[in-house]
Curated annotation (Swiss-Prot):
Designated gene of the protein: zapC
A single GO cellular-component term on record: cytoplasm
Subunit structure: Interacts directly with FtsZ.
Name the UniProt record assigns to this protein: Cell division protein ZapC
Organism: Shigella dysenteriae serotype 1 (strain Sd197)
Residue ranges of coiled coil: none
GO biological process: division septum assembly; FtsZ-dependent cytokinesis
Pfam families: ZapC_C, ZapC_N
């Protein structure tokens, strides 16, 4: 099922689940990855889904098309990205877990990025949510990964210095025509 933003959607914090929620109307609810301790004070006042939210939704949805994720996982990633932009407290970078490339790439919000774990050299796929001059807030754009003994799941947030990030090139996104 494809979800489409509309003006009936509502943001609210659910004390019972300790999560930021989005009421998608028609009985559908989205429970974000983000608990109370991660949220700004604005998260605790119910709010409507605004035009800016819808614009960001479509922007992230378009950028997430090339991720190797199911439609449901892509929708979850996009909605968590909206929560992160709107309600997540500022974070400190946790870049020591990742290999530095010595190059400074400044990604844009919505960019697909990747990093390599310093202990295993495993590639980790990320969605850039907010970008700064030196670091970017990213969401995990794969089902799971273990970083320094901590399991992270799809949509979990982590801030990373830009010298660790690389643009992700997804071969599946290229369309190759056969030469005759």
């Amino acid at each position: 099922m494809r979800i489409k933003p509309d003006d009936n959607w509502r943001w609210y914090y659910d004390k019972e689940h300790d999560r930021m929620m989005l009421d998608l109307a028609d009985g559908m609810l989205f429970r974000s990855r983000f608990a109370r301790k991660m949220l700004t004070p604005d998260a605790f006042s119910p709010a409507g889904f605004c035009v800016d939210d819808a614009s960001l939704y479509f922007s992230f949805e378009e950028k997430c098309r090339d991720f190797n994720l199911s439609k449901e996982q892509k929708a979850e990633l996009v909605l968590n990205a909206l929560v992160a932009i709107r309600y997540l407290k500022p974070q400190m970078p946790k870049s020591w877990h990742f290999v530095s490339h010595g190059e400074m790439w400044v990604p844009m919000p919505g960019d697909a990025a990747c990093v390599w774990l310093s202990d295993t050299n495993e590639q980790v796929n990320l969605l850039v949510v907010e970008s700064g001059e030196n670091a970017a807030l990213c969401l995990l754009a794969q089902p799971c990964v273990v970083i320094a003994g901590r399991a992270m799941q799809l949509g979990d947030a982590i801030k990373i210095m830009n010298d660790r990030l690389k643009p992700q090139v997804n071969v599946d996104s290229f369309s190759l025509e056969q030469a005759v």
